[in-house]
UniProtKB/Swiss-Prot annotation:
It comes from the Archaea. GO terms for molecular function: cyclic pyranopterin monophosphate synthase activity. It comes from Archaeoglobus fulgidus (strain ATCC 49558 / DSM 4304 / JCM 9628 / NBRC 100126 / VC-16). This is Probable cyclic pyranopterin monophosphate synthase. Belongs to the MoaC family. Homohexamer; trimer of dimers. Keywords: Lyase, Molybdenum cofactor biosynthesis. Its EC number is 4.6.1.17. SUPFAM superfamilies: Molybdenum cofactor biosynthesis protein C, MoaC. Substrate binds at residues 73-75, 109-110. The keyword Lyase applies.
Amino acid sequence: MELTHIEDGKVRMVDVSHKDDVDRIAVAEGYIRLRSSTIEAIINKEVAKGNVIAAANIAGVMAVKKTPELIPMCHPIPITSVKFDFDIESVGIRVKCTVKSKGKTGVEMEALTGVSVALLTIWDMVKSLEKDERGNYPKTLIEVIRVVEKVKGGKE
C-alpha cells in the first residue's frame, strides 16, 4: 500500500491539479455523553453561557472553514455548504455534520473537524454542570467520531 502523503520519507501535500472538479459530500457524526440534568438545562435554555446548540453550530461551521489551517496536508477547498444536525437524547447529544464542495479532493476532514469542534464546544458550554465535587468530569465523554457517508461525483 502506498502512502500518498509521504515521498522519500518526507511529508508532502498530494498534487491534485490533474483531478477534475466534481461534487463532493461528506457526512461525519459524533456523540457526547452528558448528565441527564445537563441535558435538561440545555433543553430548557438554562445554561449560564447561553444557547449551547447555537454556539456549537457556529463553532462547527467555523472549524469546517479553518480545517486546512489545522491539518497540515489538507487542501484548502471551496466549501459550498455546511449543515449541522443535533439530536438531543436523554444521556447525550449526537452531532452530524454534512459538508459539500465542488472540487478536486474530498471533504471528509472538514466534516470530521466540524463535528469534533462542535462536540468540544458543547463540552465547554456545559462544563460547570458536568464537573463533580473534585472538578473532574466522570460522566462526560466524547465518542465515536466517524465518517458515515462519502459521495464523489454522485457515487457513494
